[in-house]
């Protein structure tokens, strides 16, 4: 029998994650492990190796069903892991419950199956991952009956697919929807709004529409950081960035129509972009019509709507000049999973500092700018500033003072007039 340390629950979960969510360049895959696995020690006297924590990162506390699965993610799984070949056009939401050897040498396989079954009320597929040697025929029969996939982990950390689940159609709750958001082209997981001026993103569909080569057009007229502009344009849903090359979305096409209506040609529109190079003035003030278009584009970005809605609610509750710390504390109460994914870096160190093993917020850590996710507190905030939504631009994490960094709406509304 494998030792408790070699097939403890974190070891089992890390092996299962490598099988379900291998490290690839897939753009529509993302997974988080529960915050309990960010602890230094799992079994008494047996620390979790750093490499295992690194494999399990990032960490978050995501509620699915009546509890918090050990691992939750989104990915198109291969046919060997499912009882059907595919699941429509969207990758399924997957929940995993792991069980390993305890300090007494036992494995509660049945509990893992039942916990995974509970996640099926909101996930599309659920698995339990357990040491293969601990699985009985009755365990497998129960998993089949409850439509729970079963992954058997061997002493050499290979994976045996013992039972495959059928995909079920569930509407994901708000917390699970955050994981879907991170797995989409608009998620901020391991990517970046690399540029902090919206003109660089608005120009990308224009460059595609131009007869000349896209990268050359963008570099000549707008910005030389072509890859960063392309990534940001995809985040804002202006383009669909596929391996075969980017194409213009419906929203991006509207940007092109807007430019043609005002300038009659793409070349004429791009010549105006040259005048804005190096400008630090608010885009909304320098070019009001483009500022309004930016506002429309950035409002379609899911994170914007939630941030603005919660800032408005904070204003109504008397928090009229919220700091970054105030905002993150507030958001974590109402949208905990979203808050961590959007505002906190995905590294093991940052998540471990900000969240305890139960997923509760360690507020003291929020006063250190280094724990924050730059694409949100710097680039996204700058875009919201240029669009006329926020009063101040963002700052890079190493220059950030979270206590004095304000997130004020430009035009907060009076609540009684909305009723």
Report the location of each language-model feature:
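A short, highly charged nucleic-acid-interacting micro-segment common to nuclease
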Residues: 1-14, 368-373
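Conserved beta3 VAIK motif of the Hanks protein kinase fold
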Residues: 96
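Donor-sugar nucleotide-binding helix/loop cap in glycosyltransferases
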Residues: 173-419
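Nucleic-acid nuclease catalytic cores
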Residues: 104-112, 118-157
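Active-site metal-binding core of divalent-cation-utilizing nuclease and nuclease-like domains
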Residues: 4-9, 17, 21-92, 108
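Mixed-charge intrinsically disordered linker/loop segments at interdomain junctions
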Residues: 144-191
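Short amphipathic alpha-helical segments and helix-helix/interface helices
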Residues: 116, 139-140, 230, 381
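Conserved protein-kinase N-lobe ATP-binding Lys motif
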Residues: 100-102
């Amino acid at each position: 029998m494998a030792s408790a340390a070699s097939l403890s629950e974190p070891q089992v979960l890390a092996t299962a994650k490598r099988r379900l969510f291998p490290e690839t360049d897939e753009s529509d895959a993302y997974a988080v492990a529960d915050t309990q696995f960010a602890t230094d020690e799992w079994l008494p006297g047996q620390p979790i190796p750093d490499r295992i924590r690194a494999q399990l990162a990032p960490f978050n506390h995501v509620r699915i069903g009546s509890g918090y699965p050990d691992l939750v993610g989104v990915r198109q799984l291969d046919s060997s892991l499912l009882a059907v070949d595919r699941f429509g056009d969207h990758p399924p939401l997957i929940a995993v419950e792991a069980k390993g050897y305890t300090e007494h040498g036992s494995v509660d396989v049945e509990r893992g199956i039942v916990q995974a079954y509970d996640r099926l009320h909101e996930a599309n597929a659920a698995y339990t991952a357990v040491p293969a040697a601990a699985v009985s025929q009755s365990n497998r029969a129960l998993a089949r009956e409850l439509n729970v996939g079963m992954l058997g982990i061997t002493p050499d950390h290979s994976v045996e697919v013992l039972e495959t689940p059928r995909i079920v159609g569930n509407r994901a709750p708000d917390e699970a929807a955050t994981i879907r958001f991170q797995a989409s082209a608009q998620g901020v997981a391991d990517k970046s709004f690399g540029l902090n001026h919206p003109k660089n993103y608005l120009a990308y569909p224009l460059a595609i529409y131009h007869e000349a080569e896209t990268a050359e057009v963008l570099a000549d007229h707008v910005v030389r950081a072509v890859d960063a502009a392309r990534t940001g344009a995809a985040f804002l849903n202006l383009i669909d960035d596929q391996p075969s090359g980017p194409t213009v979305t419906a929203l991006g096409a509207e940007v092109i129509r807007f430019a043609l209506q005002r300038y009659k040609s793409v070349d004429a529109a791009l010549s105006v972009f040259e005048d804005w190079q190096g400008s630090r003035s608010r885009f909304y003030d320098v070019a009001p019509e483009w500022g309004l278009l930016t506002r429309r584009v950035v409002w379609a970005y899911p994170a914007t709507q939630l941030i603005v809605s919660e800032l408005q609610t904070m204003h109504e509750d008397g928090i009229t000049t919220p700091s970054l710390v105030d905002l993150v504390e507030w958001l974590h109460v109402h949208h905990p999973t979203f808050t961590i994914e959007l505002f906190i870096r995905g590294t093991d160190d940052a998540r471990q500092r900000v969240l305890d093993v139960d997923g509760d917020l360690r507020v003291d850590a929020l006063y250190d700018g280094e724990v924050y996710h730059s694409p949100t507190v710097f680039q996204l905030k700058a875009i919201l500033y240029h669009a006329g939504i926020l009063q101040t631009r963002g700052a890079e994490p190493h220059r950030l003072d979270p206590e004095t960094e304000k997130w004020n709406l430009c035009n907060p509304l009076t609540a009684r007039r909305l009723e």
